[in-house]
Amino acid sequence: MKKISFVILTMALVLLAASCEFENNSQYTPQIALSLPIRFCGHADTVVVKDTLGYRYDKDGKAVLDTIHVGDTVRMVVALSAQGNMLTGFHTTWDTAALQLEYLAMDSIMVALDTAKSNIAAGTLSFLPGYNMAVFPIRYIPRKSATTDITMEVQSDSKYSPTKFTIQQTAQ
């Protein structure tokens, strides 16, 4: 009798577990992570200097970076994560008159991109199904004295998508 009760209890637990809907448990907010911004400044009369830019967050949640000079180059690595979900897109907006911004070393993630829908030069990446993480470097160079926002937005198939992150850069 104990064996029959054990078998029935085990079958009931298996049936209960099989009827659960596990797919809806993976609803995570997609994340954007950035390495510390590195500034490279090189002028005709000086040696190239490399340093890490400091930053603080303002009341609106923008990362406000230290002031740099027109012509300095800032590089950082962008990491996108959808955790238990899949990436669907990434978009960067910036003032093209004030900044020259480019994605670098894209060969490493080209296999994950839907090239028909992506426009790398315009800051739009569209991901193929099945990818939940992407890492790539970006670089920007201020073209004129201005305070400029660089807004990054990552989308995933999560109901908590998208996520936005803004960097504010002042150049003199």
For each feature predicted by the language model, list its residue ranges:
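Exposed beta-strand face motif in extracellular beta-rich ectodomains
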Residues: 74, 146-152
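C-terminal edge beta-strand
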Residues: 161-172
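Surface-exposed, short loops/turns at beta-strand junctions within beta-sandwich domains
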Residues: 130, 141-147
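Bacterial Sec-dependent N-terminal signal peptides
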Residues: 14-44
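Sec-dependent bacterial lipoprotein signal peptides
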Residues: 1-21
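Aromatic/hydrophobic beta-strand junction motif of beta-rich domains
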Residues: 74-84, 138-140
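Coil residues (strongly favoring Ser/Thr
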Residues: 45-46, 51-52, 61, 66-67, ...
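Aromatic sugar-binding surface patches on proteins
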Residues: 116-137
